[in-house]
């Protein structure tokens, strides 16, 4: 558990932060601002408002909502079969669309029950993976990427690009609506895309087709931005600034360790 690990590190290595201060950070007031204890272990939180890039991207029509369907859940070995992405405007409307199917290198197997595309379907409508992947890299270059559980989608994309010697994704930033809704609505029974679509006033339901899923994700993103992220911006920055002195040292050390681990 990341929060438990963060507590242990803070108590051992951060002077001036006791149990009472940790409880303050984990209080409903902080939760309403979309903050978690683990945020303060990352130097980036003291360098810019956490959602500044997302809000700027929406203003500039530079947010792309993104989802993939694949042959399985192993990001290192499974193949993407569908990429759906939509550049959106501030209200969540479509600015530009990207939807392509890929001929996978392996059978879809049991994943067909999830996305409903058979090997025969993909043999007919799928394209060469290298062509589609390269086109998506260009489509998404320097954009803010948003998805639901987007770490999976980014991870399998990164693996596919490496497999075809196409470099790495060229995103300006990445935001996860799964993480965002967990922060602002921690008491929901779960944070699956279907549950969120039924809970909040949006008019599109996900179906495990990547295109349907990004339409739902785009509407949920706009909802949480207007209802939660923007209204709590001042409170969030006040809380971050109040803890900067105590946490900037350990955050800097943790950021250095992360950089070394990524080399």
Where are these regions (language model features)?
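Helix-hairpin-helix
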Residues: 2-31
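A short, structured active-site edge motif that brings together acidic residues
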Residues: 171-181
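Short, glycine/acidic-enriched loop or turn micro-motifs at the edges of active sites
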Residues: 70-72, 179, 216
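Conserved non-catalytic scaffold segment of RNase H-like nuclease domains
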Residues: 59-172, 186-208
